[in-house]
């Protein structure tokens, strides 16, 4: 059996560009792509923390070290500059891989879209 699992997540990225008349996609700083194990042309889901929008597109490389998160084409209508987004990619994973310890790559970034940490799991949510 295969399960559809979270593979990669870039958490709380700030949108730096919106290019309505670009061909489409989301350009992401190449450093962030590599850290999250997202490859060019891979399908990604984007969840806008500011307005609740959720949509899918594909990743393209943005300039390395730039902090770029550019929503292009129709995706540019789903966010404003400075909105915080979560970028996620999923994979089909065999049950045996899960049992062997398969883990996602979660990347946490700061206000300038620079990497501040990594994790391989989402902590158990508790009441506060």
From Swiss-Prot:
Annotated pathway: Cofactor biosynthesis; (R)-pantothenate biosynthesis; beta-alanine from L-aspartate: step 1/1
Manner of cofactor binding, per the entry note: Binds 1 pyruvoyl group covalently per subunit.
Cofactor(s) required for function per UniProt: pyruvate
Source species, domain of life: Bacteria
Compartments it resides in: Cytoplasm
This enzyme's EC code(s): 4.1.1.11
Gene Ontology molecular-function annotations: aspartate 1-decarboxylase activity
Gene Ontology cellular component list: cytosol
Protein residues bound to substrate: 57, 73-75
Gene3D superfamilies: 2.40.40.20
Modified residue annotations for Pyruvic acid (Ser): 25
Keywords: Autocatalytic cleavage, Cytoplasm, Decarboxylase, Lyase, Pantothenate biosynthesis, Pyruvate, Schiff base, Zymogen
Reaction(s) catalysed (UniProt annotation): L-aspartate + H(+) = beta-alanine + CO2
Active site, renumbered: 25, 58
Post-translational modification remark: Is synthesized initially as an inactive proenzyme, which is activated by self-cleavage at a specific serine bond to produce a beta-subunit with a hydroxyl group at its C-terminus and an alpha-subunit with a pyruvoyl group at its N-terminus.
One BP annotation, GO: pantothenate biosynthetic process
Assembly and interaction partners: Heterooctamer of four alpha and four beta subunits.
Function: Catalyzes the pyruvoyl-dependent decarboxylation of aspartate to produce beta-alanine.
NCBIfam families: panD (TIGR00223)
Family: Belongs to the PanD family.
Record-given protein name: Aspartate 1-decarboxylase
Organism of this sequence: Burkholderia multivorans (strain ATCC 17616 / 249)
Gene name as annotated: panD
């Amino acid at each position: 059996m295969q399960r559809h699992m979270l593979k990669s997540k870039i958490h709380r990225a700030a949108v730096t560009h919106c290019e309505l008349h670009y061909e489409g996609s989301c350009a992401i700083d190449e450093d962030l792509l590599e850290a999250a194990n997202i490859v060019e042309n891979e399908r990604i889901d984007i969840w806008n923390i500011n307005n609740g929008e959720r949509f899918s597109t594909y990743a393209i490389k943005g300039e390395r070290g730039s902090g770029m998160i550019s929503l292009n084409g129709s995706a540019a209508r789903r966010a404003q500059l400075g909105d915080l987004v979560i970028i996620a990619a999923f994979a089909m994973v065999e049950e045996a891989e899960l049992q062997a310890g398969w883990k996602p790559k979660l990347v946490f970034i700061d206000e300038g879209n620079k990497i501040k940490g990594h994790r391989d799991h989402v902590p158990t949510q508790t009441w506060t």
